[in-house]
């Protein structure tokens, strides 16, 4: 094994890097430059990505689930290279892979494009309307975090000349129409979620919490089990951050948990 390119920082994608290095000492480990800190440190990955909503929102995993998440990673492991997008890997005389930057699910999320076969390996870069189990049942909501970047990634894939795209939790998609439909499904979820969040905040003038938005909007946004409703914290927090930046929402950070409202300018409008 010459290369192991890690698409993004989640335990099921980077947790085995130390074991890969142990088994294949010569391997070059690589990841997105903006994700390096989390990928190299399981402790930082857990605190920044999986325990991110504890202090300000009172949302966190129960001890057993938290331990299961930690168990996905073996030990800390440095990477050899980081990529920012635009690089190429030559695997053979006629085999070149392009490194694409596909942020949204993480800041440094990478994709690998095999131009000779018009095949994109996109990891978790776009997520349709959520995750399904191998039995075809809805199991989890979309878990993007950075809305504008995620929408740009959808556009990037949609506009590419890829004719086959391979993700990590979704069926392989063949042909322009299938790819276009999945991109549209991914974008439509974002639009629908943003609308629902805005309407809910508008209808609750005294303010709402992130937990409340997750539990109250879960059934309106998808068919995954109610037990995983709080996983919406990832996407919804991204929409809230974007709304605050755009002046649509305001946040009271003196409250614990944080409370969100329409901004004064939005209410006046």
Model regions: which residues?
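Short, charged, surface-exposed secondary-structure boundary motifs
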Residues: 38-43, 130-134, 197
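A short catalytic or substrate-binding loop motif that flags glycine-/basic-rich loops and adjacent residues
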Residues: 81-83, 103-106, 269
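C-terminal regulatory/interaction regions
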Residues: 195-269
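Aromatic/hydrophobic pocket-lining residues that form the small-molecule binding cavity
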Residues: 14, 150, 236
């Amino acid at each position: 094994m010459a290369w192991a390119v890690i698409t993004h920082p989640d335990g099921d994608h980077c947790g085995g890097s130390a074991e890969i290095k142990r088994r294949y000492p010569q391997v070059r480990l690589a990841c997105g430059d903006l994700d390096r800190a989390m990928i190299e440190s399981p402790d930082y990955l857990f605190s920044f990505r999986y325990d991110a909503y504890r202090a300000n929102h009172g949302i966190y995993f129960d001890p057993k689930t938290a331990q299961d998440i930690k168990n996905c990673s073996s030990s800390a492991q440095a990477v050899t290279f980081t990529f920012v997008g635009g690089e190429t890997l030559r695997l053979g005389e006629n085999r070149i892979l392009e490194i694409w930057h596909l942020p949204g699910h993480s800041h440094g999320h990478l994709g690998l494009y095999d131009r000779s076969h018009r095949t994109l390996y996109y990891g978790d870069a776009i997520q349709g309307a959520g995750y399904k189990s191998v039995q075809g049942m809805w199991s989890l909501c979309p878990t993007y975090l950075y809305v504008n970047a995620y929408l740009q990634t959808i556009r990037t894939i949609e506009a590419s000349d890829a004719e086959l795209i391979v993700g990590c939790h979704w069926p392989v998609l063949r042909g322009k129409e299938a790819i276009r439909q999945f991109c549209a499904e991914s974008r439509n979820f974002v639009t629908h979620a943003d609308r629902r969040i805005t309407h809910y905040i508008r209808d609750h003038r005294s303010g709402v919490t992130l937990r409340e938005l997750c539990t109250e909007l879960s059934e309106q946004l998808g068919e995954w089990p109610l037990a995983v409703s709080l996983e919406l914290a990832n996407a919804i927090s991204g929409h809230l951050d974007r709304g605050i930046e755009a002046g649509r929402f305001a946040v009271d950070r003196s409250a614990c948990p944080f409370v969100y409202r329409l901004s004064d300018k939005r209410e006046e409008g």
